[in-house]
Amino acid sequence: MGMDMIEMIEKAEILMEALPFIQKFYGKIFVIKYGGHAMIDEKAKNWTAQDVVLLKYVGINPVVVHGGGPEINKAMEKMGKKPEFVHGLRVTDEETLDIVEMVLAGKINGDIVSKLSKFGGKAVGLSGKSGRIILAKKKLKKIKTEKGEEIEVDLGRVGETVEVNTELLEILINNGYIPVVSPIGLDEKGEAYNLNADTVAGDIAGALKAEKLILITDVDGIMDDINNPETLHRKLTASELKEMIEDGRIKGGMIPKAESALYALEHGVKSVHIINGKIPHALLLEIFTEEGIGTMITRD
């Protein structure tokens, strides 16, 4: 048997490994939070878009939620707008929100829709304002002062989700479209707010009762030591994850991801996956192989 034939048989075996997963997840909803390096690097953008389109073609229903990456900071610099901070926390004033909306709902959302379309997907760009998908309210951040007093800080147009209206998303999903959502919400008065994309992804996954929430980031998953890949947790339960937040092993940008995972699991999502978008076809490797490549979190 020649090498070409052996390679072809190996390819067939890889496809067969995916079959039980395709059968299991057929017709189910996956909410994918697209962020980090995968949004910047051209190759990684293509891998992610191809993976999302493939999911749709094998009968899975992906919903993409994206953040701003470094694009917002770049746009602010170009426009000569300096970030404002109160007690170390960034404030989103009217002018900043205009820039955030322009970058999120304009440039980034449009780029993702174009990539998905390039590979044969029917993608529709939305913001949380579209069809009032995300009802939001102002978020007041509680912090401790140097004197140990707890105070509430007004961060301007920074909000949190009150409710997710899934009607428009469900119409699009049921008609073969891939919704691509930017994390801007409206309050009851029609005022817009900038929301954390990880949190919005968890909120949408919970509201849609998605099978999976998948968070694409720049690290392999949840690790005890960020510099040591061998400390990666392949599988965690919700209570183990809570413990890691409480004892400080999860910190920085991983905190909103972990909190989003817990919220989603509490609201009916079966499993949450945190994966590294720098790995070629990370989405497919996580979903369609037995061992996966990132961290999978499930209910207790």
Curated annotation (Swiss-Prot):
Pfam families in the cross-refs: AA_kinase (PF00696)
GO cellular component, as recorded: cytoplasm
GO BP annotations listed: arginine biosynthetic process via ornithine; L-arginine biosynthetic process
Subcellular location: Cytoplasm
CDD domains named among the record's database cross-references: AAK_NAGK-C
Top EC class for this record: transferase
Main location: cytoplasm
Catalytic activity reported: N-acetyl-L-glutamate + ATP = N-acetyl-L-glutamyl 5-phosphate + ADP
Amino-acid positions noted as binding substrate in the UniProt annotation, renumbered to this chain: G68, G69, R90, N194
UniProt site (Transition state stabilizer): K33, K257
EC number: 2.7.2.8
Keywords: Amino-acid biosynthesis, Arginine biosynthesis, ATP-binding, Cytoplasm, Kinase, Nucleotide-binding, Transferase
Pathway: Amino-acid biosynthesis; L-arginine biosynthesis; N(2)-acetyl-L-ornithine from L-glutamate: step 2/4
GO molecular function: acetylglutamate kinase activity; ATP binding
Xref: InterPro entries: AceGlu_kinase-like_sf, AcgluKinase_fam, ArgB, Asp/Glu/Uridylate_kinase, NAGK-C
Similarity comment: family membership: Belongs to the acetylglutamate kinase family. ArgB subfamily.
Classification via HAMAP family: ArgB
Protein function: Catalyzes the ATP-dependent phosphorylation of N-acetyl-L-glutamate.
NCBIfam families named among the record's database cross-references: argB
Protein name per UniProt: Acetylglutamate kinase
Organism: Methanocaldococcus jannaschii (strain ATCC 43067 / DSM 2661 / JAL-1 / JCM 10045 / NBRC 100440)
Gene: argB
